[in-house]
Amino acid sequence: MKALKNIEVQLNQTPNKQISLTDPDARSMKTRGTGIVGYNVQTAVDTGYHLIVEHEVINEDVDRSQLSNMAKKARSAMGADDLIVIADRGYFKSEEILACHEAAITAIAPKTVTSIATADGRFGKADFILNAEKNEYRCPAGEALIWRFSTIEKGLKLHCYWSSACQSCAFKEQCTPSPQRRVKRWEHEGILDAMQTRLDLAPDSMRIRRQTVEHPFGTLKA
C-alpha cells in the first residue's frame, strides 16, 4: 500500500495520468476492439514508389495533431516544392488543415461527422448555405440566418448566426429543439470548404491513401 501511495503521488503529477512501470515512455493506446500499452507510429509514404519517406514514433493515442508535422517533414525529406498530403478522417483537425495551408501544403482529409443534429435525423450544417457577400446563411426554409456575434471556443474564433423566424417555422421539428437554430462558422472555415471541394473533385483520394500508406505495412507483414 505504501508503494502504491507513492505511485499515486507520481500519477497525479503526470499530464495524462499514466505511468508505465515497464517502459516509462509507453502509453495506453486505443486499438480496434481492445487496448494496448505501446506507441503510435506515424508514417508518410510517397505514391510513386510506396516508400516510407518519413516516420515518427509518438505516445499519443490519437492522430489529430500530427498532420502538418508529418507533412512538413515528408516535404523536407523528399526535397519537394509542392506537396499534396492525403490522410484519413482520424487526422482531421481544423488547426492542422490551417497549418498545412499556411505552409503551402495541399491537404485532403475527410471531415469527421460530429453533428448531434445529423445523428438525430435533423438538418445538418451542410443544409445551410453560406452567402459570403451578405455574410449570412440561408436555411432549408429559405430564411436568412444573419451574423449576431463572434466568440472564442477551445481557442478558435467562431462567428454565430441565427434567424428570428425559427419559432413560426414549419420545419422547426426537423431543425432544432432550441428556440433558434444557431450556426457557427470558424474564421478560417473557407480553407476547410476549399479542402472539401478538392475531395469532392477527387473521389478516389481515399482509395489512393489506402493503397499508398498501407502498402509498406503489407510488405513488412508478408
Where are these regions (language model features)?
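Anion-binding and metal-coordination hotspots
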Residues: M1-A222
